[in-house]
Amino acid sequence: MKIRPLHDRVIVKRLEAERKTASGIVIPDSAGEKPDQGEVLAVGNGKILDDGKVRPMAVKVGDKVLFGKYAGQTVKVEGDELLVMREEDIMGVVEA
């Protein structure tokens, strides 16, 4: 199954958080916080403005993005947990 987001929505896959502290202690899944970084897998056409024009998306497929802890709606697709969120929920793009 493939998901194509509409309008100003994006599909993001969370990046795995570091499961080990600097001193070597392994953090169990139940104790760790959900990562707030992800990779954009798909983007919609853009936000429809009040005048009917479409503002293009600022993010693109492959971008590494930062988002809030509670951003987006979680969906399962072929065993993967993905987030569907509005572009405005993205706080920034991580540049290498």
UniProtKB/Swiss-Prot annotation:
PROSITE patterns: CHAPERONINS_CPN10. Keywords: Chaperone, Cytoplasm. One of its GO terms (biological process) is chaperone cofactor-dependent protein refolding. CDD domains: cpn10. It comes from the Bacteria. One of its GO terms (molecular function) is unfolded protein binding. It is found in: Cytoplasm. Belongs to the GroES chaperonin family. Together with the chaperonin GroEL, plays an essential role in assisting protein folding. The GroEL-GroES system forms a nano-cage that allows encapsulation of the non-native substrate proteins and provides a physical environment optimized to promote and accelerate protein folding. GroES binds to the apical surface of the GroEL ring, thereby capping the opening of the GroEL channel. Heptamer of 7 subunits arranged in a ring. Interacts with the chaperonin GroEL. This is Co-chaperonin GroES. The gene is groES.
